[in-house]
């Protein structure tokens, strides 16, 4: 339907930027919240969920730096909104949302610094898709990995990372960010315990029958890594 067309195009645009950066041997940087005149639920930042949605989807698909739309907002009739400061030079509603998301990205970046991304993809309407060479395909994505998504209640984007024998998976809620709905995901974990990074903090969680069940918040993301591997 139209919504999934927009969402898949959103992912493919990011994937194409990533491919160009890789071909040029450059780190990938992306621009978030530049304009909200088209599908504002994705591109706005009036709520934390909207800002986190943009940032973590870009981060999951390879960005290691993000530019935010931060100069004075043009007239509202121009259909541009959610700058970090208003036309009067005052902090806008987006300011605190972006500040919180930036702190989480910084903490996550330090956590992932020695990891290498080995595959990325999405689950859209229950269908697993691989993101490769700038396109979204209906091919299986995980293979024989110690961590992988088994099921997702709603749409998610993910990337699998490796550090030697250690693996981890970054999962971002790709559901409508203004809905406020949680998104239940089930992750295969080849360990009795997993380290779960969320909201700038890491906690250890027991895994029942080799699985971890977690409810992602609106716009939220988690990084999961088996303990003791």
Predicted regions located by residue number:
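Active-site clefts of carbohydrate-active enzymes
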Residues: 14-49, 77-85
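Carbohydrate-binding surface patches
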Residues: 123-192, 219
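Structural recognition of the beta-strand scaffold that forms the well-ordered cores
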Residues: 27-32, 59, 65-69, 170-171
């Amino acid at each position: 339907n139209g919504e999934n067309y927009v969402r898949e195009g959103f992912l493919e645009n990011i994937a194409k930027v990533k491919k160009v950066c890789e071909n040029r041997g450059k780190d990938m940087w992306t621009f978030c919240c530049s304009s909200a005149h088209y599908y504002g639920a994705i591109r706005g930042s009036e709520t934390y969920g909207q800002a986190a949605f943009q940032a973590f989807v870009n981060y999951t698909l390879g960005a290691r730096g993000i530019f935010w739309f931060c100069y004075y907002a043009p007239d509202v009739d121009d259909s541009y909104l959610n700058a970090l400061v208003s036309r009067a030079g005052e902090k806008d509603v987006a300011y605190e949302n972006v500040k919180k998301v930036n702190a989480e990205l910084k903490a996550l970046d330090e956590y992932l610094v020695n990891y290498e991304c080995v595959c990325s993809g999405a689950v859209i309407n229950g269908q697993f898709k691989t993101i490769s060479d700038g396109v979204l395909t209906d091919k299986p994505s995980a293979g024989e990995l110690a961590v992988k998504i088994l099921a997702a209640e709603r749409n998610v984007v993910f990337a699998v990372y490796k550090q030697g024998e250690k693996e981890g998976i970054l999962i971002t809620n790709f559901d409508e960010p203004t809905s406020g709905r949680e998104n239940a995901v089930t992750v295969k974990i080849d360990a009795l315990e997993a380290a779960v990074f969320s909201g700038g903090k890491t906690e250890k969680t027991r895994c029942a029958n080799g699985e971890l069940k977690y409810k992602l918040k609106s716009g939220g993301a988690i990084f999961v890594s088996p303990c003791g591997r």
